[in-house]
Amino acid sequence: MRCSPGGVWLALAASLLHVSLQGEFQRKLYKELVKNYNPLERPVANDSQPLTVYFSLSLLQIMDVDEKNQVLTTNIWLQMSWTDHYLQWNVSEYPGVKTVRFPDGQIWKPDILLYNSADERFDATFHTNVLVNSSGHCQYLPPGIFKSSCYIDVRWFPFDVQHCKLKFGSWSYGGWSLDLQMQEADISGYIPNGEWDLVGIPGKRSERFYECCKEPYPDVTFTVTMRRRTLYYGLNLLIPCVLISALALLVFLLPADSGEKISLGITVLLSLTVFMLLVAEIMPATSDSVPLIAQYFASTMIIVGLSVVVTVIVLQYHHHDPDGGKMPKWTRVILLNWCAWFLRMKRPGEDKVRPACQHKQRRCSLASVEMSAVAPPPASNGNLLYIGFRGLDGVHCVPTPDSGVVCGRMACSPTHDEHLLHGGQPPEGDPDLAKILEEVRYIANRFRCQDESEAVCSEWKFAACVVDRLCLMAFSVFTIICTIGILMSAPNFVEAVSKDFA
Protein backbone atom coordinates (compact mmCIF):
# COMPACT_ATOMS: atom_id res chain seq x y z
CA MET A 1 0.00 0.00 0.00
CA ARG A 2 1.47 3.27 -1.07
CA CYS A 3 0.92 6.49 0.88
CA SER A 4 0.50 9.70 -1.06
CA PRO A 5 2.74 12.68 -0.27
CA GLY A 6 -0.33 14.75 0.61
CA GLY A 7 -1.36 12.31 3.35
CA VAL A 8 2.10 12.44 4.90
CA TRP A 9 2.10 16.20 5.07
CA LEU A 10 -1.40 16.18 6.54
CA ALA A 11 -0.41 13.79 9.35
CA LEU A 12 2.71 15.84 10.13
CA ALA A 13 0.71 19.05 10.36
CA ALA A 14 -1.82 17.42 12.71
CA SER A 15 0.92 16.24 15.08
CA LEU A 16 2.55 19.66 15.18
CA LEU A 17 -0.81 21.25 15.88
CA HIS A 18 -1.40 18.80 18.76
CA VAL A 19 2.00 19.57 20.31
CA SER A 20 1.51 23.29 20.02
CA LEU A 21 -1.93 23.04 21.59
CA GLN A 22 -0.57 20.93 24.46
CA GLY A 23 2.19 23.45 25.15
CA GLU A 24 -0.38 26.20 25.10
CA PHE A 25 -2.55 24.30 27.60
CA GLN A 26 0.40 23.83 29.95
CA ARG A 27 1.21 27.53 29.81
CA LYS A 28 -2.39 28.41 30.45
CA LEU A 29 -2.62 25.92 33.33
CA TYR A 30 0.51 27.25 35.02
CA LYS A 31 -0.89 30.77 34.85
CA GLU A 32 -4.20 29.68 36.30
CA LEU A 33 -2.66 27.68 39.13
CA VAL A 34 -0.20 30.32 40.34
CA LYS A 35 -2.49 33.27 39.64
CA ASN A 36 -3.78 33.67 43.18
CA TYR A 37 -1.56 31.09 44.85
CA ASN A 38 0.32 31.99 48.04
CA PRO A 39 3.15 29.58 48.95
CA LEU A 40 2.89 30.69 52.59
CA GLU A 41 -0.73 29.54 52.86
CA ARG A 42 -1.45 26.03 54.05
CA PRO A 43 -3.38 24.44 51.11
CA VAL A 44 -6.52 23.13 52.82
CA ALA A 45 -10.20 23.73 52.19
CA ASN A 46 -10.86 24.38 55.87
CA ASP A 47 -8.22 26.06 57.99
CA SER A 48 -9.41 24.21 61.07
CA GLN A 49 -8.55 20.86 59.51
CA PRO A 50 -4.99 19.47 59.54
CA LEU A 51 -3.15 18.77 56.33
CA THR A 52 -2.12 15.13 56.11
CA VAL A 53 1.43 14.53 54.88
CA TYR A 54 2.63 11.00 54.20
CA PHE A 55 6.32 10.54 54.84
CA SER A 56 8.76 7.78 53.96
CA LEU A 57 12.30 7.36 52.75
CA SER A 58 14.38 5.19 50.46
CA LEU A 59 17.76 4.13 51.83
CA LEU A 60 20.35 3.81 49.07
CA GLN A 61 23.63 3.44 50.93
CA ILE A 62 25.31 3.51 54.32
CA MET A 63 28.30 5.62 53.43
CA ASP A 64 30.16 5.85 56.73
CA VAL A 65 29.85 5.14 60.43
CA ASP A 66 32.23 7.35 62.39
CA GLU A 67 32.55 5.61 65.76
CA LYS A 68 34.91 8.22 67.17
CA ASN A 69 32.66 11.21 66.40
CA GLN A 70 29.45 9.12 66.55
CA VAL A 71 28.10 10.27 63.20
CA LEU A 72 26.21 8.18 60.64
CA THR A 73 26.42 9.23 56.99
CA THR A 74 23.72 7.87 54.66
CA ASN A 75 22.47 8.43 51.13
CA ILE A 76 18.68 8.77 51.34
CA TRP A 77 15.81 9.85 49.13
CA LEU A 78 12.96 11.37 51.11
CA GLN A 79 9.40 10.69 49.99
CA MET A 80 6.67 13.17 50.91
CA SER A 81 3.17 13.36 49.50
CA TRP A 82 0.11 15.48 50.29
CA THR A 83 -2.94 16.93 48.61
CA ASP A 84 -2.93 20.60 47.64
CA HIS A 85 -6.47 21.92 47.49
CA TYR A 86 -5.49 24.83 45.22
CA LEU A 87 -3.60 22.80 42.63
CA GLN A 88 -6.45 20.89 40.97
CA TRP A 89 -7.76 21.08 37.41
CA ASN A 90 -10.04 19.36 34.99
CA VAL A 91 -8.09 17.22 32.56
CA SER A 92 -10.73 17.69 29.86
CA GLU A 93 -10.13 21.43 29.86
CA TYR A 94 -6.42 20.93 29.52
CA PRO A 95 -6.03 17.94 27.24
CA GLY A 96 -2.74 16.11 27.48
CA VAL A 97 -1.69 17.85 30.67
CA LYS A 98 -1.80 15.23 33.43
CA THR A 99 1.04 16.44 35.65
CA VAL A 100 2.89 19.67 36.22
CA ARG A 101 6.09 20.46 38.10
CA PHE A 102 6.82 23.37 40.35
CA PRO A 103 10.29 24.40 41.47
CA ASP A 104 11.22 25.13 45.04
CA GLY A 105 9.55 28.21 46.48
CA GLN A 106 6.59 28.51 44.10
CA ILE A 107 4.13 26.32 46.00
CA TRP A 108 3.66 25.28 49.61
CA LYS A 109 5.57 22.27 50.89
CA PRO A 110 6.07 20.88 54.39
CA ASP A 111 9.14 21.96 56.33
CA ILE A 112 10.16 18.47 57.37
CA LEU A 113 13.74 18.25 58.61
CA LEU A 114 16.03 15.72 60.24
CA TYR A 115 15.96 16.53 63.94
CA ASN A 116 19.23 14.83 64.86
CA SER A 117 21.18 16.23 61.94
CA ALA A 118 24.95 16.60 62.33
CA ASP A 119 25.49 18.40 59.03
CA GLU A 120 27.00 21.89 58.93
CA ARG A 121 24.02 23.15 56.90
CA PHE A 122 21.58 21.14 59.00
CA ASP A 123 19.31 20.61 55.96
CA ALA A 124 21.33 18.47 53.58
CA THR A 125 18.60 17.80 50.99
CA PHE A 126 18.73 18.88 47.37
CA HIS A 127 15.53 20.81 46.65
CA THR A 128 13.95 19.25 43.59
CA ASN A 129 10.70 20.01 41.75
CA VAL A 130 7.35 19.07 43.22
CA LEU A 131 5.28 16.79 40.98
CA VAL A 132 1.55 17.65 40.98
CA ASN A 133 -1.27 15.76 39.20
CA SER A 134 -4.77 16.90 38.28
CA SER A 135 -6.31 15.83 41.60
CA GLY A 136 -3.91 18.05 43.55
CA HIS A 137 -1.76 15.17 44.77
CA CYS A 138 1.76 16.50 45.34
CA GLN A 139 4.84 14.33 45.46
CA TYR A 140 8.18 15.65 46.69
CA LEU A 141 11.30 13.44 46.48
CA PRO A 142 14.38 15.37 47.68
CA PRO A 143 17.64 13.34 47.79
CA GLY A 144 20.43 14.10 50.21
CA ILE A 145 23.57 12.96 51.98
CA PHE A 146 22.44 12.92 55.59
CA LYS A 147 24.81 13.15 58.53
CA SER A 148 23.00 12.21 61.69
CA SER A 149 24.19 11.94 65.25
CA CYS A 150 24.09 8.35 66.47
CA TYR A 151 25.05 6.87 69.80
CA ILE A 152 27.56 4.14 68.99
CA ASP A 153 27.48 1.38 71.58
CA VAL A 154 30.91 -0.23 71.42
CA ARG A 155 30.22 -2.69 74.24
CA TRP A 156 30.41 -5.73 71.92
CA PHE A 157 32.91 -4.40 69.37
CA PRO A 158 33.73 -5.95 66.88
CA PHE A 159 30.65 -8.21 67.19
CA ASP A 160 28.30 -5.28 67.68
CA VAL A 161 24.92 -4.34 66.22
CA GLN A 162 24.20 -0.62 66.00
CA HIS A 163 20.82 1.09 66.05
CA CYS A 164 20.97 4.59 64.58
CA LYS A 165 17.80 6.68 64.60
CA LEU A 166 16.71 9.13 61.92
CA LYS A 167 14.06 11.39 63.42
CA PHE A 168 12.05 13.51 60.99
CA GLY A 169 9.34 16.03 61.73
CA SER A 170 7.92 19.42 60.87
CA TRP A 171 9.97 22.26 62.20
CA SER A 172 7.14 24.80 62.66
CA TYR A 173 3.77 23.03 62.28
CA GLY A 174 2.07 21.23 65.11
CA GLY A 175 -0.22 18.24 64.95
CA TRP A 176 -3.35 20.36 64.59
CA SER A 177 -1.98 21.94 61.41
CA LEU A 178 0.05 19.13 59.88
CA ASP A 179 -0.72 15.48 60.47
CA LEU A 180 2.48 13.56 59.70
CA GLN A 181 1.80 9.93 58.79
CA MET A 182 4.45 7.27 58.31
CA GLN A 183 4.89 4.85 55.44
CA GLU A 184 7.28 1.91 55.32
CA ALA A 185 10.85 2.59 54.26
CA ASP A 186 12.08 1.32 50.91
CA ILE A 187 15.38 -0.60 50.73
CA SER A 188 14.92 -2.17 47.29
CA GLY A 189 17.70 -0.01 45.83
CA TYR A 190 20.11 -0.44 48.73
CA ILE A 191 23.81 -0.74 47.84
CA PRO A 192 25.63 -3.14 50.23
CA ASN A 193 28.35 -1.75 52.45
CA GLY A 194 31.70 -3.48 52.93
CA GLU A 195 31.79 -2.91 56.68
CA TRP A 196 28.14 -3.10 57.70
CA ASP A 197 25.25 -5.43 56.93
CA LEU A 198 21.83 -3.80 56.90
CA VAL A 199 19.51 -5.74 59.18
CA GLY A 200 16.43 -3.57 58.76
CA ILE A 201 15.05 -0.06 58.95
CA PRO A 202 11.81 -0.13 60.94
CA GLY A 203 9.84 3.05 61.48
CA LYS A 204 7.66 4.44 64.22
CA ARG A 205 5.35 7.43 64.48
CA SER A 206 5.16 9.21 67.80
CA GLU A 207 3.72 12.40 69.23
CA ARG A 208 5.38 14.65 71.73
CA PHE A 209 3.85 17.34 73.88
CA TYR A 210 5.69 20.45 74.99
CA GLU A 211 4.93 22.75 77.88
CA CYS A 212 4.37 25.70 75.58
CA CYS A 213 1.55 24.21 73.55
CA LYS A 214 -1.42 21.91 73.96
CA GLU A 215 -1.23 20.46 70.48
CA PRO A 216 0.94 17.41 69.83
CA TYR A 217 4.00 17.51 67.63
CA PRO A 218 4.20 14.33 65.56
CA ASP A 219 7.44 12.89 64.27
CA VAL A 220 8.54 9.82 62.35
CA THR A 221 11.62 7.91 63.49
CA PHE A 222 13.35 5.33 61.33
CA THR A 223 15.88 3.10 63.08
CA VAL A 224 18.74 1.94 60.86
CA THR A 225 19.75 -1.43 62.31
CA MET A 226 23.10 -2.66 61.04
CA ARG A 227 25.51 -5.41 62.02
CA ARG A 228 29.25 -4.97 61.79
CA ARG A 229 31.08 -7.36 59.50
CA THR A 230 33.87 -8.84 61.60
CA LEU A 231 36.10 -10.41 58.96
CA TYR A 232 38.39 -7.38 58.72
CA TYR A 233 38.78 -6.97 62.47
CA GLY A 234 39.11 -10.71 62.98
CA LEU A 235 42.03 -11.01 60.56
CA ASN A 236 43.78 -7.80 61.58
CA LEU A 237 43.15 -7.64 65.33
CA LEU A 238 41.68 -10.76 66.92
CA ILE A 239 43.72 -13.52 65.27
CA PRO A 240 47.08 -11.69 65.73
CA CYS A 241 46.21 -11.03 69.37
CA VAL A 242 45.36 -14.69 69.97
CA LEU A 243 48.64 -15.75 68.36
CA ILE A 244 50.62 -13.23 70.39
CA SER A 245 48.99 -14.38 73.61
CA ALA A 246 49.90 -17.95 72.65
CA LEU A 247 53.50 -16.84 72.16
CA ALA A 248 53.48 -15.60 75.74
CA LEU A 249 53.16 -19.23 76.85
CA LEU A 250 56.50 -20.01 75.22
CA VAL A 251 58.15 -17.99 77.97
CA PHE A 252 57.65 -20.97 80.28
CA LEU A 253 59.13 -23.39 77.73
CA LEU A 254 62.25 -21.34 77.11
CA PRO A 255 65.26 -22.58 79.13
CA ALA A 256 66.36 -20.30 81.94
CA ASP A 257 69.96 -20.43 80.77
CA SER A 258 69.04 -18.95 77.38
CA GLY A 259 68.78 -15.45 78.84
CA GLU A 260 65.77 -14.57 76.65
CA LYS A 261 62.83 -15.35 78.92
CA ILE A 262 62.35 -11.77 80.12
CA SER A 263 62.97 -10.36 76.64
CA LEU A 264 60.29 -12.56 75.10
CA GLY A 265 57.73 -11.60 77.75
CA ILE A 266 58.42 -7.87 77.38
CA THR A 267 58.24 -8.12 73.57
CA VAL A 268 54.84 -9.81 73.73
CA LEU A 269 53.63 -7.17 76.18
CA LEU A 270 54.72 -4.35 73.86
CA SER A 271 53.02 -6.03 70.90
CA LEU A 272 49.73 -6.17 72.76
CA THR A 273 50.14 -2.50 73.69
CA VAL A 274 50.47 -1.59 70.01
CA PHE A 275 47.24 -3.44 69.17
CA MET A 276 45.57 -1.73 72.12
CA LEU A 277 46.51 1.66 70.70
CA LEU A 278 45.09 0.71 67.30
CA VAL A 279 41.75 -0.09 68.91
CA ALA A 280 41.81 3.14 70.93
CA GLU A 281 42.23 5.19 67.74
CA ILE A 282 38.93 4.03 66.24
CA MET A 283 36.89 3.90 69.45
CA PRO A 284 35.05 6.93 70.87
CA ALA A 285 36.52 8.52 73.97
CA THR A 286 33.66 7.42 76.18
CA SER A 287 33.51 5.83 79.60
CA ASP A 288 30.03 4.39 79.21
CA SER A 289 31.28 0.96 78.23
CA VAL A 290 34.51 -0.87 77.53
CA PRO A 291 34.73 -2.58 74.11
CA LEU A 292 34.81 -6.35 74.09
CA ILE A 293 38.09 -6.45 72.23
CA ALA A 294 39.60 -3.99 74.73
CA GLN A 295 38.56 -6.31 77.56
CA TYR A 296 40.25 -9.19 75.78
CA PHE A 297 43.42 -7.18 75.21
CA ALA A 298 43.46 -6.02 78.83
CA SER A 299 43.03 -9.54 80.20
CA THR A 300 45.73 -10.84 77.86
CA MET A 301 48.09 -8.07 78.93
CA ILE A 302 47.46 -8.94 82.58
CA ILE A 303 48.27 -12.59 81.87
CA VAL A 304 51.44 -11.66 79.99
CA GLY A 305 52.44 -9.23 82.75
CA LEU A 306 52.00 -11.91 85.38
CA SER A 307 54.04 -14.30 83.25
CA VAL A 308 56.89 -11.79 83.26
CA VAL A 309 56.67 -11.55 87.05
CA VAL A 310 56.69 -15.34 87.38
CA THR A 311 59.64 -15.50 84.99
CA VAL A 312 61.61 -13.23 87.30
CA ILE A 313 60.89 -15.62 90.18
CA VAL A 314 61.91 -18.60 88.04
CA LEU A 315 65.20 -16.96 87.12
CA GLN A 316 65.83 -16.12 90.75
CA TYR A 317 65.29 -19.76 91.68
CA HIS A 318 67.43 -21.04 88.82
CA HIS A 319 70.40 -18.78 89.57
CA HIS A 320 70.08 -18.98 93.34
CA ASP A 321 73.36 -18.55 95.20
CA PRO A 322 74.16 -21.74 97.15
CA ASP A 323 75.65 -19.57 99.90
CA GLY A 324 72.33 -17.75 100.20
CA GLY A 325 70.79 -20.45 102.34
CA LYS A 326 68.80 -23.63 102.06
CA MET A 327 65.34 -23.87 100.56
CA PRO A 328 62.58 -23.30 103.14
CA LYS A 329 60.78 -26.40 104.26
CA TRP A 330 57.33 -25.21 103.12
CA THR A 331 58.71 -24.36 99.68
CA ARG A 332 60.29 -27.80 99.41
CA VAL A 333 57.07 -29.52 100.46
CA ILE A 334 54.82 -27.54 98.11
CA LEU A 335 57.04 -27.38 95.03
CA LEU A 336 59.27 -30.43 95.20
CA ASN A 337 56.71 -32.83 96.65
CA TRP A 338 53.11 -31.84 95.91
CA CYS A 339 53.49 -29.86 92.68
CA ALA A 340 56.12 -32.19 91.26
CA TRP A 341 53.87 -35.18 91.97
CA PHE A 342 50.88 -33.44 90.39
CA LEU A 343 52.87 -32.50 87.28
CA ARG A 344 54.46 -35.98 87.06
CA MET A 345 57.95 -34.51 87.26
CA LYS A 346 60.91 -36.49 88.61
CA ARG A 347 63.99 -35.03 90.17
CA PRO A 348 67.25 -35.51 88.30
CA GLY A 349 69.06 -38.65 89.51
CA GLU A 350 66.15 -39.82 91.62
CA ASP A 351 66.21 -43.40 90.32
CA LYS A 352 69.97 -44.02 90.65
CA VAL A 353 72.91 -42.90 92.70
CA ARG A 354 75.13 -40.32 91.14
CA PRO A 355 78.10 -41.88 89.29
CA ALA A 356 80.40 -39.35 90.90
CA CYS A 357 79.55 -40.75 94.33
CA GLN A 358 80.18 -44.31 93.19
CA HIS A 359 83.47 -43.26 91.67
CA LYS A 360 84.55 -41.59 94.89
CA GLN A 361 83.64 -44.65 96.90
CA ARG A 362 85.51 -46.89 94.52
CA ARG A 363 88.50 -44.55 94.49
CA CYS A 364 88.64 -44.37 98.26
CA SER A 365 88.31 -48.14 98.60
CA LEU A 366 91.02 -48.80 96.05
CA ALA A 367 93.36 -46.39 97.78
CA SER A 368 92.75 -48.12 101.07
CA VAL A 369 93.43 -51.52 99.59
CA GLU A 370 96.59 -50.40 97.83
CA MET A 371 98.01 -48.66 100.84
CA SER A 372 97.12 -51.59 103.05
CA ALA A 373 99.04 -53.90 100.75
CA VAL A 374 102.10 -51.66 100.66
CA ALA A 375 102.09 -50.85 104.35
CA PRO A 376 104.85 -52.45 106.53
CA PRO A 377 104.15 -54.50 109.59
CA PRO A 378 102.35 -52.73 112.37
CA ALA A 379 104.44 -49.91 113.63
CA SER A 380 103.81 -46.40 114.71
CA ASN A 381 104.34 -44.78 111.30
CA GLY A 382 102.81 -47.58 109.29
CA ASN A 383 99.82 -47.83 111.54
CA LEU A 384 99.25 -44.11 111.18
CA LEU A 385 99.37 -44.29 107.40
CA TYR A 386 97.12 -47.32 107.39
CA ILE A 387 94.67 -45.72 109.75
CA GLY A 388 94.67 -42.50 107.70
CA PHE A 389 93.63 -44.15 104.48
CA ARG A 390 91.07 -46.30 106.20
CA GLY A 391 89.66 -43.06 107.54
CA LEU A 392 89.30 -41.71 104.01
CA ASP A 393 87.61 -44.93 103.02
CA GLY A 394 85.10 -44.28 105.76
CA VAL A 395 83.94 -41.11 104.00
CA HIS A 396 81.11 -42.52 101.91
CA CYS A 397 77.91 -41.18 100.35
CA VAL A 398 74.74 -41.18 102.41
CA PRO A 399 71.70 -39.15 101.28
CA THR A 400 70.37 -36.84 103.96
CA PRO A 401 66.65 -36.39 104.58
CA ASP A 402 66.58 -32.64 103.85
CA SER A 403 68.35 -32.93 100.52
CA GLY A 404 66.40 -32.22 97.38
CA VAL A 405 68.53 -34.51 95.24
CA VAL A 406 69.53 -38.09 96.07
CA CYS A 407 73.18 -38.28 96.97
CA GLY A 408 73.38 -34.54 96.57
CA ARG A 409 74.75 -33.87 100.02
CA MET A 410 77.75 -35.80 101.22
CA ALA A 411 77.39 -37.02 104.79
CA CYS A 412 80.39 -38.51 106.50
CA SER A 413 80.09 -41.61 108.66
CA PRO A 414 83.22 -41.46 110.75
CA THR A 415 84.74 -44.75 111.81
CA HIS A 416 86.89 -45.58 114.77
CA ASP A 417 90.04 -45.30 112.69
CA GLU A 418 89.04 -41.84 111.50
CA HIS A 419 88.62 -40.71 115.07
CA LEU A 420 92.06 -41.98 115.70
CA LEU A 421 93.29 -40.08 112.68
CA HIS A 422 91.71 -36.82 113.75
CA GLY A 423 92.63 -37.19 117.36
CA GLY A 424 96.11 -38.63 117.02
CA GLN A 425 99.25 -36.63 116.78
CA PRO A 426 101.70 -37.21 113.95
CA PRO A 427 105.02 -38.65 115.00
CA GLU A 428 107.83 -36.25 115.55
CA GLY A 429 110.05 -37.77 112.91
CA ASP A 430 107.53 -37.64 109.99
CA PRO A 431 106.65 -34.01 109.17
CA ASP A 432 106.10 -34.88 105.48
CA LEU A 433 103.48 -37.43 106.34
CA ALA A 434 101.68 -34.90 108.52
CA LYS A 435 101.55 -32.45 105.61
CA ILE A 436 100.22 -35.14 103.30
CA LEU A 437 97.44 -36.02 105.72
CA GLU A 438 96.54 -32.35 106.11
CA GLU A 439 96.30 -31.92 102.35
CA VAL A 440 94.16 -35.04 102.06
CA ARG A 441 91.81 -33.68 104.70
CA TYR A 442 91.57 -30.37 102.82
CA ILE A 443 90.80 -32.09 99.51
CA ALA A 444 88.14 -34.25 101.12
CA ASN A 445 86.49 -31.24 102.76
CA ARG A 446 86.65 -29.34 99.46
CA PHE A 447 84.87 -32.15 97.61
CA ARG A 448 82.33 -32.41 100.40
CA CYS A 449 81.53 -28.65 100.24
CA GLN A 450 81.37 -28.75 96.44
CA ASP A 451 78.85 -31.59 96.52
CA GLU A 452 76.78 -29.73 99.08
CA SER A 453 76.74 -26.60 96.88
CA GLU A 454 75.80 -28.64 93.82
CA ALA A 455 72.99 -30.27 95.78
CA VAL A 456 71.59 -26.89 96.84
CA CYS A 457 71.83 -25.52 93.27
CA SER A 458 70.17 -28.61 91.82
CA GLU A 459 67.38 -28.28 94.36
CA TRP A 460 66.67 -24.66 93.40
CA LYS A 461 66.92 -25.42 89.66
CA PHE A 462 64.43 -28.23 90.00
CA ALA A 463 62.10 -25.89 91.89
CA ALA A 464 62.41 -23.40 89.00
CA CYS A 465 61.47 -26.14 86.51
CA VAL A 466 58.43 -27.04 88.62
CA VAL A 467 57.28 -23.40 88.71
CA ASP A 468 57.76 -23.13 84.93
CA ARG A 469 55.71 -26.25 84.25
CA LEU A 470 53.00 -25.27 86.72
CA CYS A 471 52.65 -21.77 85.25
CA LEU A 472 52.60 -23.17 81.72
CA MET A 473 49.55 -25.25 82.54
CA ALA A 474 47.84 -22.55 84.61
CA PHE A 475 48.40 -19.75 82.11
CA SER A 476 47.32 -21.98 79.22
CA VAL A 477 44.02 -22.65 80.97
CA PHE A 478 43.54 -18.97 81.80
CA THR A 479 44.29 -17.92 78.21
CA ILE A 480 41.79 -20.39 76.78
CA ILE A 481 39.13 -19.37 79.29
CA CYS A 482 39.65 -15.65 78.57
CA THR A 483 39.60 -16.17 74.81
CA ILE A 484 36.46 -18.27 74.77
CA GLY A 485 34.67 -16.59 77.67
CA ILE A 486 35.18 -12.99 76.57
CA LEU A 487 34.78 -13.32 72.81
CA MET A 488 31.83 -15.70 72.93
CA SER A 489 29.97 -13.49 75.40
CA ALA A 490 28.87 -11.27 72.50
CA PRO A 491 25.16 -11.86 71.71
CA ASN A 492 25.71 -12.31 67.97
CA PHE A 493 29.12 -14.01 68.05
CA VAL A 494 27.88 -17.21 66.41
CA GLU A 495 25.98 -15.31 63.72
CA ALA A 496 28.95 -13.08 62.93
CA VAL A 497 31.38 -15.99 62.67
CA SER A 498 29.00 -18.09 60.56
CA LYS A 499 28.33 -15.27 58.09
CA ASP A 500 31.70 -13.54 57.88
CA PHE A 501 34.13 -16.43 58.25
CA ALA A 502 32.16 -19.07 56.35
From Swiss-Prot:
What mutagenesis or variant effect is reported for residue 491 to A?
A: Loss of ligand-gated cation channel activity
Which residues make up the binding site for Ca(2+)? 42, 44, 172, 210
Q: What would be one Gene Ontology cellular-component term for the protein?
A: postsynapse
Cysteine pairs forming cystine bridges in this chain are 150-164, 212-213
Q: Which residues form the signal peptide?
A: 1-22
Q: Please give the biological process terms from Gene Ontology that the record holds.
A: acetylcholine receptor signaling pathway; calcium ion transport; chemical synaptic transmission; cognition; dendrite arborization; dendritic spine organization; excitatory postsynaptic potential; intracellular calcium ion homeostasis
* Keyword Signal included in the entry's annotation: yes
Which family does the record assign? Belongs to the ligand-gated ion channel (TC 1.A.9) family. Acetylcholine receptor (TC 1.A.9.1) subfamily. Alpha-7/CHRNA7 sub-subfamily.
Subunit record text = Homopentamer. Can also form heteropentamers with CHRNB2, mainly found in basal forebrain cholinergic neurons. Interacts with RIC3; which is required for proper folding and assembly. Interacts with LYPD6. Interacts with CANX.
What name does the UniProt record give this protein?
Answer: Neuronal acetylcholine receptor subunit alpha-7
Lineage of the source organism? Eukaryota, Metazoa, Chordata, Craniata, Vertebrata
Q: Which gene encodes it?
A: CHRNA7
